[in-house]
Amino acid sequence: MKDRIFKQDIGKQFEFDAQVASVFDDMLERSIPHYKEVLGLIVDFCSYTLESSKSAIPLVYDLGSSTGTTLLALSQALSTHTRFIGIDSSQAMIDKASLKAQAYNANIEFICTDLLEYDFLHSDIVIANYSLQFIRPMQRPALLQKIYNALTEGGILIVSEKMTSHHRILDRQMIERYVRYKQEQGYTKTEISKKREALENVLVPFSLEENIAMLKDIGFSGIEVLFKWVNFGTLIAKK
């Protein structure tokens, strides 16, 4: 279904409700630059990590799993002995993800809960695609520490985020380029403006430097930029 949510006034802050869940796949592909390329990189680096895993049944988490697209791609590419768990705070997203998994006969578990309250199991891989930016900034380090503690030695965290620049002019230019990208995907200026207003104080991005510093402070031994396009980036961090 095509994303037309912001063609009219929604009169509230952005939230991952049933209306958003119904068009979320289209919203992702039209709102996140090079979405499919990043997904392909995630599958590749998860595969590399699991090749050296010593876990009898490796565990992969997707935090903010939305409609399950990432875990579905991983389940089709990785060993059948891998356990997949998706966590999301939106029941509407969980319901849609579960239906997709059933349709593809994929063995994926989905849990509806708050990430900040969840007790992570020992895991080999944790993916957080465009989800940390919706966590209050002061709460992100504690969540990342829980993730780090649950990861096995050699395990990885993959983080994709919208990012800011500390340079005022460059930040404005990057925003302008992203607006142009969304227009190229068929969104109108009005839709773009309304969504930006709805996301105000809901999505709080960090800079690339801030994200890397936060991961270093947690204790990750290696952190690299896996992908970067203007104000979007994907990081991989190894324990």
Swiss-Prot record:
InterPro entries assigned: CmoA, Methyltransf_25, SAM-dependent_MTases_sf
Gene3D superfamilies, per the entry: Vaccinia Virus protein VP39
Binding locations of S-adenosyl-L-methionine: Y35, G64, S65, S66, D114, L115, N129, R196
GO MF, one example: carboxyl- or carbamoyltransferase activity
Disulphide-bridged cysteine pairs: none
EC nos: 2.1.3.-
Job description of the protein: Catalyzes the conversion of S-adenosyl-L-methionine (SAM) to carboxy-S-adenosyl-L-methionine (Cx-SAM).
The protein's assembly and partners: Homodimer.
Protein name: Carboxy-S-adenosyl-L-methionine synthase
Organism: Helicobacter hepaticus (strain ATCC 51449 / 3B1)
